[in-house]
Amino acid sequence: MSMGSNFQESFQKALCSMEEGLNGLNSLVEKSVFPDDDEITSELTIPGPKRIFYVADAIRKGWSIEKIYSLTKIDYWFLDQIKELIDIEEKLYDSNIEELDKDYLQEIKEKGFSDSRIAEMIGVPEDELREHRKKRNVYPIYRRVDTCAAEFETSTCYMYSSYGGKCESNPTTKKKILVIGSGPNRIGQGIEFDYCCVHASLAMQEEGYESIMVNCNPETVSTDYDVSNRLYFEPITSEKILDIIDIENPEGVIIQFGGQTPLKLADVLSDKGVNILGTNVDAIDRSEDRERFQELVNKLNLKQPTNGTAKNQREALKKAEKIGFPIVVRPSYVLGGRAMQLVNNTKELEKYLNEAVEVSNSKPILLDSYLTDAIEVDVDVVSDGINIEIGGILQHIEQAGIPVSYTHLRAHETRGNLVCRLLLE
């Protein structure tokens, strides 16, 4: 969900919030290379998850609003709003950064264009565009959500960004901590991450800090009005987080409880001098980079399945052949089971590498020999580096590595003392 001062702003903020690699109303393909007419006609006629992007690409390709309406029956008002965004986009592609004066920047920011999207279209780094925008004195303002539909006067600390008008944020001078939420729920990043953020916020308040929550999911506990002292309902992007940090000036930012969504901002926040509380950026990278993590496991001489890391498709296929199928493939910089897959042969691995994941020097993948008939156990622990407290032991009822029906696997009983013994080893 997103909020803004107009449809175009809200629409583009919503697209940025989806965590689908979008920074606005992106094209489905590279600029000037569009789907063929038959594909567009089919996608416009039959509603689907990518329909709105086909609407935009049809406009980019020169289709009339009338033709698009006849296929989609989307109201003309919405189609005109989208066309206006495409018109601005075409103008931006022909612009350079010096042509973006204060009035022009203000206009396009009011229509929801993100710094990342603008920078992409004019061909400059996002950081350069951000600094240019600030030099032109174009900043977001924050409006408070009226939770009573104007029936009577109320003051909430529930805010969203916009451009133009009076800022209603009124930040305090109290000591404060900002907690970055988990954004949209999905496989591998579920509600448990949100609940961690909730407890982080409550703990900060108990310690005498003003807690600030940033999230964009209305279906979570973290966006309840009484969980934090101040709530910003915003996309979890570097632009939005840095803007909030600029106005609130927190003593520190917590990123480790929201899953992969805030963790991917670790480097940019650290580079900007933001004080990241808890697990440091290097430790986060060591646990998320499959190659670095593998080096640590080997150094500690821990037991593990036969495995290997790969930085390109050729290397992955070669190591898979050496390990032997079936194997479990995991990308770097993801949590939970997202983009993790069990592959049984070379053909399945090639499909996975081509369609499901990006493999590069900076994003190696891990290939593990799949353990058949294995029991999977989760152990939650807290340690100060010397002492270990076990918070809970959870045995999976499904086969390790892949969800299957309980009836396909006999019930097991794992004793807590066995787990403790293995931990001590």
What are these regions (language model features)?
Residues V29-P35, D267-S270, L394-Y406:
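Flexible hinge/switch segments at interdomain interfaces of large molecular machines
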Residues S10, I68, I118, G183, ...:
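Buried hydrophobic positions in well-ordered alpha/beta secondary-structure cores of metabolic enzymes
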Residues L105-R130, P235-F257, V359-E376:
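Phosphate/diphosphate-binding loops
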Residues L300-P305, K322, P326-V329, L342-T372, ...:
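Conserved ATP-binding module of the ATP-grasp superfamily
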Residues E131-N137, R143-L302, K311-K318:
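ATP-binding N-terminal substructure of ATP-dependent carboxylate-amine bond-forming enzymes
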Residues S5, E9-K50, A56-K61, K67-F152, ...:
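Terminal amphipathic helices with adjacent charged low-complexity linkers/tails
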Residues P305-Q341, Y370-I386:
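Rossmann-like NAD(P)H-binding beta-loop-alpha module
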Residues T407-T414, L418:
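Conserved small/polar residues in nucleotide/adenosyl-binding loops
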